[in-house]
Amino acid sequence: MTKSYSESGLMGEPQPQGPPSWTDECLSSQDEEHEADKKEDDLETMNAEEDSLRNGGEEEDEDEDLEEEEEEEEEDDDQKPKRRGPKKKKMTKARLERFKLRRMKANARERNRMHGLNAALDNLRKVVPCYSKTQKLSKIETLRLAKNYIWALSEILRSGKSPDLVSFVQTLCKGLSQPTTNLVAGCLQLNPRTFLPEQNQDMPPHLPTASASFPVHPYSYQSPGLPSPPYGTMDSSHVFHVKPPPHAYSAALEPFFESPLTDCTSPSFDGPLSPPLSINGNFSFKHEPSAEFEKNYAFTMHYPAATLAGAQSHGSIFSGTAAPRCEIPIDNIMSFDSHSHHERVMSAQLNAIFHD
């Protein structure tokens, strides 16, 4: 049995290969283009990944810094006492400028307020009954004196009567310091030792106290200062002029004045004076009769004309046979005997002076 040519060729003999065709070349060029595109895409993706990694690292660094700052602040807050309210913001330039502007406005408001307060206190110092060219009252002393002055004037208006000068000055000086009290006493021409109760206790018994029945100022005068609103204000040129007391009882009244008294003529005794009242800007003292003065120092005896002839008549006054010839009030004798010998002599001298 024999094989055909075709079969033998297909089975054993290899067929020769020809040159590559144009289709194969097209396919190979397309594959190269695809590979180049893939490489470019890979490079772009790699660059993008690198950029993202860099940016991510920076963000992570910032986040880490913020976390560290927050941790430090928390540690500081743990060490310090916790503050209530909103957290303090960081100061920027704009905030600093706004803060400075607010402080400047607040300082200006406070400065204007203090200037107005000082001006009002200066006006008040011109009204209160205290004036000195060398000394200036403090703010608290000015307010205290003004309060006492208003209280004293309101008491005068309420009662409708003029109180005693000593009580008026005591009301003015209530709660004031010693320098202010001395200034008030100097303006009213008084000795502060005469109306201070704590000092009256230490005074010797032979010196007259503030409650003495004879007046401190047995005369009338007008002082252009010490007005009360709305009658006027006190000017710095006003000076307080006071006349000295009469010659006959200057020694008895000397403790009430700072300076020694001089001799001068004076009108007759008119009784104690009331506290100063402001009328058209001038202070005047009003004479008032004093029942207490007549009560304390009235020791009267009604003698017949014949009993004053000789010494025998004086000896017979206190005898039993001479009782019908004189009249001696019993209450006056008791009140007179209660005084000491020195006060008895002083009262007798004053009685002789005032009733002659």
Curated annotation (Swiss-Prot):
One of its GO terms (biological process) is signal transduction involved in regulation of gene expression. Its main location: cytoplasm. It is found in: Cytoplasm; Nucleus. Residues 1-94 are annotated as: Disordered. Residues 81-93 have a biased composition (Basic residues). Phosphorylated. In islet cells, phosphorylated on Ser-274 upon glucose stimulation; which may be required for nuclear localization. In activated neurons, phosphorylated on Ser-335; which promotes dendritic growth. Phosphorylated by MAPK1; phosphorylation regulates heterodimerization and DNA-binding activities. Phosphorylation on Ser-266 and Ser-274 increases transactivation on the insulin promoter in glucose-stimulated insulinoma cells. Gene3D superfamilies: Helix-loop-helix DNA-binding domain. It holds the Pfam family HLH. The modification Phosphoserine is found at residues 162, 259, 266, 274, 335. It is linked to Maturity-onset diabetes of the young 6: A form of diabetes that is characterized by an autosomal dominant mode of inheritance, onset in childhood or early adulthood (usually before 25 years of age), a primary defect in insulin secretion and frequent insulin-independence at the beginning of the disease. Efficient DNA-binding requires dimerization with another bHLH protein. Heterodimer with TCF3/E47; the heterodimer is inhibited in presence of ID2, but not NR0B2, to E-box element. Interacts with EP300; the interaction is inhibited by NR0B2. Interacts with RREB1. Interacts with ATOH8. Acts as a transcriptional activator: mediates transcriptional activation by binding to E box-containing promoter consensus core sequences 5'-CANNTG-3'. Associates with the p300/CBP transcription coactivator complex to stimulate transcription of the secretin gene as well as the gene encoding the cyclin-dependent kinase inhibitor CDKN1A. This is Neurogenic differentiation factor 1. It comes from Homo sapiens.
